[in-house]
Amino acid sequence: VIRFNPLGLNEGATPEAQLWVIMAQIQQELELRNRAEMLVTDRAVVDNFAYLLRTTGGEDPFSVRPLVRRWCETYDMFVRLLPDVPLKVDGVRSTNTRFRNEIEQILDTILPSFIPEDRLITVRASEITERFDWGSLIERLVGLPEEAENVVAQPVTLIPTLWD
C-alpha cells in the first residue's frame, strides 16, 4: 500500500499521508478478503496507526483509533517481526535506525491494547530463514489437518490487482 501513497512516507510522512495508508490498507483488504480462504499481509492497520501516531506526537487527530481497534479484530493472527537485522536499501523502507526504533517503541506501547496476547506471535526477523517453520504457525491458526480420503486438489487462479 505504502508504495502508492501520493502524500509522502517514512520520516517525511504527514498525518494525512498516514491516514491515506490506513484507509488504503483497509480498502485493499476488503477487496481481497473474498478472493481467498486466507489473506496474508506484510503489515496490519495497527502498524500504520503507529506511523500515524509518530507523525502526530501520539495524538489521533482523525479519531481512527476505534476503527483500527475494530479492524484488528478481523485478523486471526499477528506475527510481529522484531527488527534485529540490518536495514537494507529497497527504495521504499527507511534505512534510518532511529526512525525504526521510534516506530517499534510505539508498537511496544499500543500492541497490547489492540491485539489479544493469544493472537500475537513475536519472532526475531533474524529467525526468518529458508528453514523457518511457517507450518507450525499455520497449524496454530487453522489447527492440525484432518485426515481426508479422496481429496482432490483444486486449481488456484491468481487475479492481479491494482496493487500487484
Give the ranges of each region predicted by the language model.
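Conserved substrate/cofactor phosphate-moiety recognition/catalytic segment
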Residues: V1-I26
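Short loop/turn segments at strand-loop or loop-helix junctions that form parts
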Residues: V1, D42-V45, R80-V85
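Hydrophobic helix-cap positions at the C-terminus of alpha-helices
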Residues: Q28, L32, I110, F114, ...
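Alpha-helical elements of Rossmann-like donor-binding domains used by nucleotide-donor carbohydrate transfer enzymes
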Residues: W20, A24-Q27, I106, S136, ...
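A glycine- and Lys/Arg-enriched "phosphate-lid" helix/loop adjacent to the NTP-binding pocket
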Residues: T55-F132
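A basic- and aromatic-enriched beta-loop-alpha substructure that forms the phosphate/nucleotide-
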Residues: N34-G57
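Short amphipathic alpha-helices and their capping/turn segments at secondary-structure boundaries
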Residues: Q18-L39, F62-Y75
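C-terminal accessory "lid"/substrate-recognition subdomains
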Residues: I115-T122, T129-D164
